[in-house]
Amino acid sequence: MSKGIVALAMSGGVDSSVSAYILKERGYEVIGIYMDLWRDEREEYCNKSAAEDARRVAEKLDIPFHIINIGKEFKANVIDYFIDEYLSGRTPNPCVACNKTIKFEAFFNAAKEFGADFMATGHYCKIEERNRRKVIVKAEDDKKDQTYMMYNLKQYQLERTIMPCGEYRKEHIREIAENIGLDVYNKKDSQEICFIPDNDHGGFIKRNYKSKVSEGNFVDKAGKIIGKHKGIIYYTIGQRKGLGIALGKPAYVIDINPITNEVVIGDEEDIFHTELIAKDVNFIPFDKLEKSMELEAKVRYSAKPSKATIIPLGNNKVKVVFQNKQRAITKGQSVVLYDKDMLVGGGIIEEIV
Protein backbone atom coordinates (compact mmCIF):
# COMPACT_ATOMS: atom_id res chain seq x y z
CA MET A 1 0.00 0.00 0.00
CA SER A 2 1.36 3.44 -0.96
CA LYS A 3 2.40 5.81 1.80
CA GLY A 4 1.39 8.70 -0.43
CA ILE A 5 2.55 10.69 -3.43
CA VAL A 6 5.84 12.60 -3.13
CA ALA A 7 6.95 15.34 -5.52
CA LEU A 8 10.75 15.21 -5.48
CA ALA A 9 12.86 18.19 -6.55
CA MET A 10 15.42 16.59 -8.88
CA SER A 11 18.58 18.50 -9.79
CA GLY A 12 20.36 15.81 -11.77
CA GLY A 13 22.79 15.31 -8.90
CA VAL A 14 23.45 12.21 -6.84
CA ASP A 15 21.61 13.35 -3.70
CA SER A 16 18.19 13.96 -5.22
CA SER A 17 18.62 10.91 -7.48
CA VAL A 18 19.24 8.56 -4.56
CA SER A 19 16.42 10.28 -2.65
CA ALA A 20 14.07 9.08 -5.39
CA TYR A 21 15.26 5.51 -4.91
CA ILE A 22 15.01 5.66 -1.10
CA LEU A 23 11.49 7.08 -1.24
CA LYS A 24 10.38 4.35 -3.66
CA GLU A 25 11.88 1.70 -1.39
CA ARG A 26 9.94 3.15 1.53
CA GLY A 27 6.67 2.77 -0.31
CA TYR A 28 6.00 6.24 -1.69
CA GLU A 29 4.80 7.04 -5.19
CA VAL A 30 7.49 9.41 -6.47
CA ILE A 31 7.08 12.14 -9.08
CA GLY A 32 10.38 13.62 -10.24
CA ILE A 33 10.29 17.34 -10.97
CA TYR A 34 13.15 19.43 -12.36
CA MET A 35 12.96 23.18 -11.82
CA ASP A 36 14.03 25.24 -14.82
CA LEU A 37 14.99 28.27 -12.79
CA TRP A 38 16.43 30.87 -15.09
CA ARG A 39 18.06 31.57 -18.41
CA ASP A 40 19.29 34.74 -20.04
CA GLU A 41 18.79 35.62 -23.72
CA ARG A 42 21.67 33.34 -24.69
CA GLU A 43 20.35 30.57 -22.37
CA GLU A 44 23.75 30.66 -20.73
CA TYR A 45 22.45 29.56 -17.34
CA CYS A 46 19.93 26.95 -18.44
CA ASN A 47 21.63 23.74 -17.34
CA LYS A 48 20.33 21.35 -19.96
CA SER A 49 22.75 18.58 -19.01
CA ALA A 50 21.45 18.60 -15.42
CA ALA A 51 17.87 18.30 -16.65
CA GLU A 52 18.86 15.38 -18.89
CA ASP A 53 20.68 13.66 -16.00
CA ALA A 54 17.51 14.00 -13.90
CA ARG A 55 15.37 12.63 -16.74
CA ARG A 56 17.65 9.59 -17.20
CA VAL A 57 17.53 8.83 -13.47
CA ALA A 58 13.73 9.06 -13.50
CA GLU A 59 13.60 6.64 -16.45
CA LYS A 60 16.01 4.25 -14.71
CA LEU A 61 13.89 4.27 -11.54
CA ASP A 62 10.63 4.15 -13.52
CA ILE A 63 9.09 7.28 -12.03
CA PRO A 64 7.16 10.07 -13.80
CA PHE A 65 9.28 13.10 -14.69
CA HIS A 66 8.32 16.70 -15.36
CA ILE A 67 10.11 20.00 -15.96
CA ILE A 68 8.49 23.12 -14.54
CA ASN A 69 9.52 26.70 -15.21
CA ILE A 70 9.87 28.83 -12.10
CA GLY A 71 12.12 31.34 -13.83
CA LYS A 72 9.99 34.41 -13.15
CA GLU A 73 9.82 33.73 -9.41
CA PHE A 74 13.52 32.83 -9.27
CA LYS A 75 14.60 36.05 -10.97
CA ALA A 76 12.44 38.24 -8.73
CA ASN A 77 13.20 36.55 -5.41
CA VAL A 78 16.76 35.32 -5.82
CA ILE A 79 18.66 37.00 -8.66
CA ASP A 80 17.25 40.52 -8.28
CA TYR A 81 17.57 40.25 -4.50
CA PHE A 82 21.17 39.05 -4.87
CA ILE A 83 22.08 42.00 -7.09
CA ASP A 84 20.24 44.59 -4.97
CA GLU A 85 22.00 43.40 -1.82
CA TYR A 86 25.47 43.71 -3.34
CA LEU A 87 24.63 47.15 -4.74
CA SER A 88 23.55 48.11 -1.20
CA GLY A 89 26.91 47.11 0.28
CA ARG A 90 25.69 43.84 1.78
CA THR A 91 26.71 40.23 1.08
CA PRO A 92 23.65 38.06 0.44
CA ASN A 93 23.24 34.31 0.65
CA PRO A 94 21.22 33.33 -2.44
CA CYS A 95 20.70 29.74 -1.25
CA VAL A 96 18.85 30.96 1.85
CA ALA A 97 16.64 33.16 -0.34
CA CYS A 98 16.07 30.30 -2.80
CA ASN A 99 15.02 27.85 -0.10
CA LYS A 100 12.60 30.39 1.38
CA THR A 101 10.89 31.54 -1.81
CA ILE A 102 11.54 28.88 -4.45
CA LYS A 103 12.18 25.36 -3.15
CA PHE A 104 9.86 25.51 -0.17
CA GLU A 105 7.28 27.93 -1.54
CA ALA A 106 7.02 27.91 -5.34
CA PHE A 107 7.98 24.23 -5.60
CA PHE A 108 5.88 23.38 -2.53
CA ASN A 109 2.85 24.88 -4.29
CA ALA A 110 3.70 23.14 -7.56
CA ALA A 111 3.85 19.81 -5.72
CA LYS A 112 0.25 20.27 -4.61
CA GLU A 113 -0.79 20.95 -8.22
CA PHE A 114 0.69 17.57 -9.17
CA GLY A 115 -1.51 15.96 -6.53
CA ALA A 116 1.37 15.23 -4.16
CA ASP A 117 0.84 14.61 -0.46
CA PHE A 118 4.47 15.51 0.29
CA MET A 119 7.47 17.20 -1.28
CA ALA A 120 11.05 16.01 -0.96
CA THR A 121 14.55 17.32 -1.64
CA GLY A 122 18.08 15.96 -1.54
CA HIS A 123 19.18 18.25 1.30
CA TYR A 124 21.27 16.93 4.17
CA CYS A 125 18.91 17.64 7.08
CA LYS A 126 16.64 15.58 9.29
CA ILE A 127 13.04 16.43 10.17
CA GLU A 128 11.80 15.12 13.51
CA GLU A 129 8.91 15.72 15.88
CA ARG A 130 9.71 17.17 19.30
CA ASN A 131 7.16 18.56 21.75
CA ARG A 132 4.41 18.15 19.16
CA ARG A 133 6.18 20.33 16.61
CA LYS A 134 8.20 19.48 13.54
CA VAL A 135 11.83 20.51 13.93
CA ILE A 136 14.95 20.38 11.77
CA VAL A 137 17.93 18.45 13.13
CA LYS A 138 21.52 18.30 11.90
CA ALA A 139 22.32 15.61 9.34
CA GLU A 140 24.18 12.39 10.10
CA ASP A 141 27.00 13.68 7.89
CA ASP A 142 28.19 16.77 9.74
CA LYS A 143 30.41 17.87 6.83
CA LYS A 144 27.42 17.95 4.48
CA ASP A 145 24.86 19.33 6.96
CA GLN A 146 22.67 22.00 5.32
CA THR A 147 20.53 23.11 8.26
CA TYR A 148 22.09 26.60 8.04
CA MET A 149 20.04 27.20 4.88
CA MET A 150 16.73 25.97 6.33
CA TYR A 151 15.84 28.33 9.16
CA ASN A 152 12.97 29.99 7.28
CA LEU A 153 10.81 26.87 7.05
CA LYS A 154 7.35 26.95 8.64
CA GLN A 155 5.38 24.19 10.35
CA TYR A 156 3.00 23.68 7.42
CA GLN A 157 6.00 23.10 5.13
CA LEU A 158 7.85 20.78 7.51
CA GLU A 159 4.74 18.65 8.02
CA ARG A 160 4.75 17.82 4.31
CA THR A 161 8.50 17.69 3.57
CA ILE A 162 10.84 14.69 3.46
CA MET A 163 14.66 14.88 3.28
CA PRO A 164 15.96 11.31 2.98
CA CYS A 165 19.67 12.18 2.68
CA GLY A 166 19.78 13.57 6.21
CA GLU A 167 19.96 10.05 7.58
CA TYR A 168 22.98 9.03 5.48
CA ARG A 169 26.61 9.95 5.04
CA LYS A 170 27.57 11.27 1.61
CA GLU A 171 29.79 8.30 0.78
CA HIS A 172 26.87 5.97 1.52
CA ILE A 173 24.64 7.96 -0.86
CA ARG A 174 27.25 7.58 -3.62
CA GLU A 175 27.58 3.88 -2.81
CA ILE A 176 23.82 3.37 -3.15
CA ALA A 177 23.84 5.23 -6.48
CA GLU A 178 26.63 3.03 -7.83
CA ASN A 179 25.01 -0.18 -6.57
CA ILE A 180 21.70 0.56 -8.32
CA GLY A 181 23.42 1.60 -11.54
CA LEU A 182 22.93 5.36 -11.58
CA ASP A 183 25.43 7.13 -13.86
CA VAL A 184 25.47 10.16 -11.54
CA TYR A 185 27.06 8.18 -8.67
CA ASN A 186 30.40 9.99 -9.13
CA LYS A 187 29.05 13.35 -10.29
CA LYS A 188 30.81 16.24 -8.56
CA ASP A 189 28.93 18.37 -6.06
CA SER A 190 28.22 21.88 -7.34
CA GLN A 191 30.30 24.50 -5.53
CA GLU A 192 29.31 27.68 -7.31
CA ILE A 193 26.16 29.80 -7.23
CA CYS A 194 23.85 28.03 -9.68
CA PHE A 195 23.16 31.11 -11.84
CA ILE A 196 26.82 32.18 -11.84
CA PRO A 197 28.68 29.12 -13.16
CA ASP A 198 32.02 30.94 -13.41
CA ASN A 199 31.67 32.05 -9.75
CA ASP A 200 32.38 35.68 -10.72
CA HIS A 201 29.53 37.48 -8.98
CA GLY A 202 31.05 40.91 -9.67
CA GLY A 203 31.24 40.23 -13.39
CA PHE A 204 27.67 38.92 -13.38
CA ILE A 205 26.31 42.04 -11.66
CA LYS A 206 28.33 44.38 -13.88
CA ARG A 207 27.05 42.67 -17.04
CA ASN A 208 23.46 43.12 -15.91
CA TYR A 209 23.71 46.50 -14.13
CA LYS A 210 26.80 48.18 -15.57
CA SER A 211 25.46 51.70 -14.96
CA LYS A 212 25.11 51.03 -11.23
CA VAL A 213 28.67 49.80 -10.69
CA SER A 214 31.25 52.56 -10.37
CA GLU A 215 34.72 53.06 -8.97
CA GLY A 216 35.10 54.72 -5.60
CA ASN A 217 37.54 55.33 -2.80
CA PHE A 218 39.19 53.11 -0.26
CA VAL A 219 39.30 55.06 3.01
CA ASP A 220 40.83 54.40 6.41
CA LYS A 221 38.90 54.54 9.69
CA ALA A 222 39.43 58.30 9.87
CA GLY A 223 37.96 58.79 6.38
CA LYS A 224 41.28 59.50 4.67
CA ILE A 225 41.41 58.36 1.04
CA ILE A 226 44.05 55.64 0.61
CA GLY A 227 43.25 54.28 -2.84
CA LYS A 228 40.68 53.50 -5.52
CA HIS A 229 38.35 50.50 -5.63
CA LYS A 230 36.60 49.09 -8.70
CA GLY A 231 33.07 48.98 -7.23
CA ILE A 232 31.59 48.01 -3.85
CA ILE A 233 30.07 44.83 -5.31
CA TYR A 234 33.54 43.27 -5.42
CA TYR A 235 34.14 43.45 -1.67
CA THR A 236 32.92 41.86 1.53
CA ILE A 237 33.69 42.28 5.23
CA GLY A 238 36.94 40.61 6.27
CA GLN A 239 38.31 40.49 2.72
CA ARG A 240 42.07 40.81 2.43
CA LYS A 241 42.94 39.42 -0.99
CA GLY A 242 42.34 41.27 -4.23
CA LEU A 243 42.19 44.77 -2.75
CA GLY A 244 44.93 46.12 -5.00
CA ILE A 245 46.36 48.52 -2.43
CA ALA A 246 49.73 48.41 -0.68
CA LEU A 247 49.84 49.85 2.84
CA GLY A 248 52.93 48.09 4.09
CA LYS A 249 50.82 45.92 6.41
CA PRO A 250 47.88 43.52 6.07
CA ALA A 251 44.70 45.43 5.17
CA TYR A 252 41.13 44.23 5.62
CA VAL A 253 37.70 45.44 4.52
CA ILE A 254 35.94 46.49 7.74
CA ASP A 255 32.93 48.35 6.33
CA ILE A 256 31.18 49.22 3.06
CA ASN A 257 29.26 52.47 2.62
CA PRO A 258 26.92 52.36 -0.41
CA ILE A 259 25.84 55.99 0.05
CA THR A 260 29.36 57.41 -0.33
CA ASN A 261 30.53 54.47 -2.47
CA GLU A 262 33.45 53.95 -0.07
CA VAL A 263 35.13 50.80 1.19
CA VAL A 264 36.63 51.22 4.66
CA ILE A 265 39.99 49.56 5.31
CA GLY A 266 41.36 48.62 8.73
CA ASP A 267 43.36 46.09 10.70
CA GLU A 268 42.47 42.46 11.37
CA GLU A 269 41.37 43.29 14.92
CA ASP A 270 38.71 45.58 13.46
CA ILE A 271 36.80 42.69 11.88
CA PHE A 272 36.11 40.93 15.19
CA HIS A 273 32.83 41.69 17.01
CA THR A 274 30.59 40.10 19.62
CA GLU A 275 27.16 41.64 18.93
CA LEU A 276 24.76 41.91 16.02
CA ILE A 277 21.13 42.66 15.28
CA ALA A 278 19.22 40.35 12.94
CA LYS A 279 15.95 41.00 11.12
CA ASP A 280 13.32 38.78 9.46
CA VAL A 281 13.86 36.18 12.17
CA ASN A 282 12.03 32.86 12.05
CA PHE A 283 11.85 30.27 14.82
CA ILE A 284 11.01 26.61 14.28
CA PRO A 285 10.47 24.88 17.68
CA PHE A 286 8.22 27.78 18.78
CA ASP A 287 6.47 30.71 17.14
CA LYS A 288 8.00 33.60 19.05
CA LEU A 289 10.94 34.26 21.36
CA GLU A 290 9.37 35.65 24.54
CA LYS A 291 12.54 36.13 26.61
CA SER A 292 16.32 35.94 26.30
CA MET A 293 17.70 32.50 25.54
CA GLU A 294 21.14 30.89 25.71
CA LEU A 295 21.89 29.08 22.46
CA GLU A 296 24.66 28.52 19.95
CA ALA A 297 24.87 30.65 16.82
CA LYS A 298 26.96 30.93 13.69
CA VAL A 299 27.31 33.77 11.22
CA ARG A 300 28.29 31.82 8.11
CA TYR A 301 27.70 28.38 6.66
CA SER A 302 31.24 27.13 7.26
CA ALA A 303 31.59 28.44 10.84
CA LYS A 304 31.32 26.39 14.01
CA PRO A 305 28.40 27.36 16.28
CA SER A 306 29.48 29.54 19.21
CA LYS A 307 27.71 30.22 22.53
CA ALA A 308 25.49 33.30 22.45
CA THR A 309 22.61 35.04 24.20
CA ILE A 310 19.60 35.73 21.97
CA ILE A 311 17.57 38.78 23.04
CA PRO A 312 14.13 39.52 21.50
CA LEU A 313 13.72 43.09 20.21
CA GLY A 314 10.26 42.94 18.63
CA ASN A 315 9.37 43.46 14.95
CA ASN A 316 10.89 40.08 14.08
CA LYS A 317 14.32 41.22 15.26
CA VAL A 318 16.77 39.83 17.80
CA LYS A 319 20.06 40.90 19.28
CA VAL A 320 22.74 38.21 19.35
CA VAL A 321 25.52 38.58 21.92
CA PHE A 322 28.36 36.08 21.51
CA GLN A 323 30.54 34.97 24.42
CA ASN A 324 33.59 35.19 22.17
CA LYS A 325 34.43 37.58 19.34
CA GLN A 326 33.37 36.43 15.88
CA ARG A 327 35.37 37.04 12.73
CA ALA A 328 33.87 39.11 9.91
CA ILE A 329 30.20 39.36 10.89
CA THR A 330 28.70 40.51 7.60
CA LYS A 331 25.50 42.42 6.83
CA GLY A 332 23.24 40.45 4.52
CA GLN A 333 24.47 37.07 5.67
CA SER A 334 22.44 34.89 8.03
CA VAL A 335 22.93 34.27 11.73
CA VAL A 336 21.59 30.81 12.50
CA LEU A 337 20.70 29.50 15.95
CA TYR A 338 21.09 26.00 17.39
CA ASP A 339 20.24 24.09 20.54
CA LYS A 340 22.73 21.22 20.35
CA ASP A 341 21.69 19.28 17.21
CA MET A 342 18.42 21.16 16.67
CA LEU A 343 17.98 24.17 14.39
CA VAL A 344 16.16 26.81 16.44
CA GLY A 345 15.92 29.55 13.82
CA GLY A 346 17.77 32.42 12.21
CA GLY A 347 17.61 35.78 10.51
CA ILE A 348 19.43 38.23 8.26
CA ILE A 349 22.26 40.23 9.84
CA GLU A 350 21.14 43.86 9.68
CA GLU A 351 23.59 45.62 11.96
CA ILE A 352 26.91 44.97 13.67
CA VAL A 353 26.87 46.50 17.14
Curated annotation (Swiss-Prot):
Signal peptide: none annotated. It catalyses: S-sulfanyl-L-cysteinyl-[protein] + uridine(34) in tRNA + AH2 + ATP = 2-thiouridine(34) in tRNA + L-cysteinyl-[protein] + A + AMP + diphosphate + H(+). It is an enzyme of class 2 (transferase). CDD domains: MnmA_TRMU-like. GO terms for molecular function: ATP binding; tRNA binding; tRNA-uridine 2-sulfurtransferase activity. Its main location: cytoplasm. The active site is at residues 98, 194. Disulfide bonds join 98-194. The keyword Transferase applies. The record marks 123, 333 as: Interaction with tRNA. Its EC number is 2.8.1.13. This is tRNA-specific 2-thiouridylase MnmA 2. It comes from Clostridium botulinum (strain Loch Maree / Type A3).
